[in-house]
A protein has these predicted regions:
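Gly/Pro-biased beta-strand-loop elements
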Residues: 95-199, 253, 261-263
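LysM (lysin motif) carbohydrate-binding repeats in extracellular/periplasmic proteins that recognize
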Residues: 50-77, 131-132, 219
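Exported/periplasmic cell-wall-interacting domains
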Residues: 24-26, 75, 162-263
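Bacterial N-terminal signal peptides
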Residues: 8-16
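Intrinsically disordered, low-complexity Ser/Thr-rich linker and spacer segments
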Residues: 32-39, 85-109
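Loop/turn positions that initiate beta-strands
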Residues: 79-83, 252
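Primarily a LysM-type cell-wall glycan-binding module
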Residues: 30-62
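Bacterial N-terminal signal peptides that target proteins for export
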Residues: 1-8
Length: 263
């Protein structure tokens, strides 16, 4: 009799274990659920995306401004999520929450500022902002280190040695990667291309738009336009020879990381 009772007992154990495993899945957030100090500078409302709606369909040639303001890429603008939509789109034209002038970088030919609180990165030349992009960094669990660093290596075709693309065995692509820190546990931290879901979602690295990568691995979007990772990478390494692999950089740009994750 005990032999036949064993199977139902095992089944019950399995059913109770399953929810615990599912609970470990990383939580997703809509951009409307994330607060930034610069939100107060713009009047906006939450808008829930409907089926078949896209950033391009809703905002025409201003879709990139809305994407920047929400720190999101096109692939992650899903039906059901809520976006921050400015009442006046002109209020977010070329949106950036970063200072146009950074006195601490006046003596630097190239300088990178990462603001975790705002989830934005800026590139400076002699203390003047030349371009900026939204980012996805680590959250309170996978913390992005703060402080002063320097880009010491680069790798155009870099891939993760720890993480895979979801539901595949393909190493997660970290293209246009700039290494700025190696921890005492020998964990390397990079600025690189990745998905931008609209909230901090990395394992500690600093992620930038890379629609080239998304088209290659996810076949979406059809026409890549957001290529912040490539822009920063090419600016940072300048004329240094690049064979696509890991290359050390003797005097790379200084990197200053400030603030804390909004989640």
């Amino acid at each position: 009799v005990k032999k036949y009772l064993l199977l139902p007992s095992l089944l019950l154990i399995f059913l109770f274990i399953q929810p615990a495993a599912n609970a470990a899945v990383k939580k997703r957030y809509s951009p409307c659920k994330i607060s930034y100090p610069s939100d107060a500078l713009v009047e906006w409302d939450c808008y829930r995306l409907k089926r078949n709606e896209t950033l391009e369909k809703l905002f025409g040639d201003r879709w990139q401004d809305v994407a920047r303001f929400n720190r999101i890429d096109r692939r992650h603008a899903w039906p059901g999520m809520t976006l921050k939509v400015p009442r006046q789109l002109d209020d977010i034209k070329d949106f950036t929450p970063l200072p146009a002038v950074l006195p601490a970088a006046e003596q630097d030919e190239k300088f990178i500022l990462v603001n975790l609180t705002e989830q934005f990165l800026g590139a400076y030349e002699q203390g003047r902002l030349v371009f900026s992009f939204p980012i996805a960094t680590g959250d309170s669990k996978f913390v992005t280190p703060t402080g002063e660093f320097r880009v010491t290596a680069f790798s155009r075709n870099h891939v993760s040695s720890l993480y895979k693309i979801e539901k595949t065995r393909i190493p997660y692509p970290m293209h246009y990667a700039l290494r700025f820190f190696i921890s005492r546990k020998e964990v390397a931290f990079w600025i690189h291309g990745r998905d931008l879901p609209g909230y901090p979602a990395s394992h500690g690295c600093v992620g930038l738009y890379d629609e080239e990568m998304q088209k290659k691995y996810y076949r979406n979007p059809d026409e890549p336009e957001l290529m912040a990772a490539r822009t920063l990478y090419e600016w940072a390494i300048g004329t240094t020879p690049d064979d696509g692999g890991l290359t050390r950089l003797k005097e790379g740009p200084r990197v200053l990381i400030i603030g804390e994750s909004p989640i």
